[in-house]
């Protein structure tokens, strides 16, 4: 057999897949299941998106794009996100990826050495904790507190978690995972 890297012992799983198995078993017994656990809610793709995809394929736009993403898309995302957040975002600050997991891992590899701490939101994306520990770091969770307007970070509590060994704080918009404002 092949010897595998010891760090694989630290690689966690995404709990949503365990929930998916339990949901499938529940559904197999005839129960109604609303599959929100994987973010795959089977909503049909909007017709204008299908049309744009078909036009792009017909125009031969099927090869590689620039590493950080198509410039026009980055510009549109910067404008839209900036408008929603009430801030100015440059297209150079926007990177389009094929998914969240690879970029989270690359970010942590860039800013964290083994033994360092990273603060991450809980509830949040389970991959944060898994990848921090996989890469040899210490995952330190922080939470959001309910307020009259929704939820907010308890800044004093967050500051109390910061140590000289803290290398990063991951911020996660509460729209994902709990659709809160």
Where are these regions (language model features)?
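A short helix-loop-beta submotif of the ANL/AMP-binding
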Residues: 134-140
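Short acidic capping loops at alpha-helix termini that bridge into adjacent secondary structure
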Residues: 88-94, 114-117, 165
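Active-site phosphate-binding strand-loop segment of PLP-dependent enzymes
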Residues: 140, 145-181
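Conserved PLP-anchoring active-site segment centered on the Schiff-base-forming lysine
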Residues: 110-132
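CheY-like receiver
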Residues: 22, 107, 157-161
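N-terminal small-domain helix-loop-helix segment of the aminotransferase-like
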Residues: 5-99, 106
């Amino acid at each position: 057999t092949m010897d595998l890297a010891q760090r694989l012992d630290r690689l966690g799983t995404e709990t949503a897949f365990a929930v998916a198995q339990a949901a499938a078993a529940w559904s197999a017994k005839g129960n109604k299941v609303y599959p929100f656990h994987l973010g795959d809610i089977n909503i049909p793709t909007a017709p204008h998106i299908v049309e744009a995809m078909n036009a792009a394929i017909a125009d031969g736009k099927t090869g590689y794009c620039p590493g950080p993403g198509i410039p026009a898309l980055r510009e549109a995302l910067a404008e839209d996100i900036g408008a929603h957040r009430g801030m100015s975002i440059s297209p150079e600050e926007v990177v389009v990826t094929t998914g969240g997991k690879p970029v989270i891992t690359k970010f942590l590899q860039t800013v964290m050495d083994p033994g360092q701490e990273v603060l991450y939101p809980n509830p949040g994306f389970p991959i944060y904790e898994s990848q921090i520990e996989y890469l040899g770091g210490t995952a330190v969770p922080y939470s959001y507190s309910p307020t009259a307007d929704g939820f907010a970070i308890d800044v004093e509590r967050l500051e109390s978690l910061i140590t000289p060994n803290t290398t990063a704080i991951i911020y996660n918009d509460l729209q994902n995972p709990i659709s809160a404002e």
